[in-house]
C-alpha cells in the first residue's frame, strides 16, 4: 500500500488508541488471601509512589494516569486523541494460578473497567481479561464481559503458562472453544506478549522487552496460522499488539519454511501463511516510520490501527507521531486513526460522538 500525496493531518478526525493499559488503583490482595506470592500486589508509599510487587520483588512503578480516567482523557487531549480502548496490564493474566483464584482477580478487573466505560462512554471502550488456563471459565467470563458488562472483547497473552508448569501455545486444541466463542460473539481479541520466552537467559539490557516481546508475538501469530485457528474461524477478529512483533517482518522466512518443509510446517493447515496477513489486525506501534510503512505495504492500511502501549515508557510517547511521519492521504489516515478500530471492535463512530 503506497499512499498518494500526503495531505495535512486533520486534527478534528476521530482518533482511537486501541492499545492502552488500565488498572484500578487497588485490586484484591490475592497474595495475602491465598498465600501465593506470585500474585501482583500494589504498594502505595507515603511519598506518593505506586509500585507493583510480584514474588516479593519490585516489578514496576505505575502512576495515577494508569487508573485515573479523567487524567487520562486530559493527557490524550493534548494529542487530539479522544478514545482509548483499555486493557489490563499483562502481569495480571496469572495463567499459572488456580483457575478460580485467577477468575476472582479477572472479574474484579473487568468490573472496574466496565464501570469506567459506562461512566465515560465517549472516551473509553474495553477489552476484558479471562483465565485461559481454564477454557471453560474463560468462555464463561468472555460471555459475561460481552453480554453483561458490554465490553468489546478481551485481551489474552501470547501463550498460556499452566498451573502444573506446562504451557499451551495458541494452537492448543484445549483453547479452540474459547476462540470459537469469541468468533460467535463477534468479540475483538487483542493478543499481547507476556512471560517472554528466554527471559531467564536475558537478564540484562531490558532484552525480554526488546527481543522477547517481538518473538512472543511471532510465536502467537504463527500458532494461530499454522494451527488452523484462523482458517477454521473466518469470523474471528484478532489484533496482534506491538505491530505483530516480528511476524510481519519475517513473513518471507516463514513462507519459505512453509514452502520448503511442508512436512514440518504445513501439518495442520495447508494454506500459505502469507495470506493471513489480511486476516489479522495489527496496531501501529512499531517505533519507526519505515517499519510502519512496511507494515502498511505488506498487510494493508485496512488491517492497521493506532496503538500506543500507553502509559508505559516503551510505548509511543506522543500518540500517532509515527503515523504522522508516513505519507498518507486522508482516507488512509481515517482508517489508521479510527476506521480499522471501529471495524475490529464492531462499533459505530456515533458511539463516540
Identify what each model region corresponds to.
Residues 3-4:
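Residue-identity detector for glycine
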Residues 7-18, 25-83, 111-119, 140-144, ...:
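Mid-to-C-terminal alpha-helical segments outside catalytic/metal-binding sites
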Residues 10-11, 82-224:
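Active-site gating/metal-coordination segments in enzymes
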Residues 16-18, 84-86, 125-128, 154-156, ...:
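Hydrophobic faces of well-ordered beta-strands that scaffold small-molecule active sites
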Residues 21, 159, 194-195, 244, ...:
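Catalytic metal-binding/acid-base residues of hydrolase active sites
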Residues 21-64, 197-215, 257-277:
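Active-site gating loops and adjacent loop-to-helix segments of metal-dependent hydrolytic enzymes
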Residues 26-31, 97, 166-168, 201-204, ...:
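Short aromatic-enriched loop/helix-cap "lid" or pocket-rim segments at secondary-structure transitions
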Residues 226-228, 234-277:
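Aromatic-lined glycan-binding groove of carbohydrate-active enzymes
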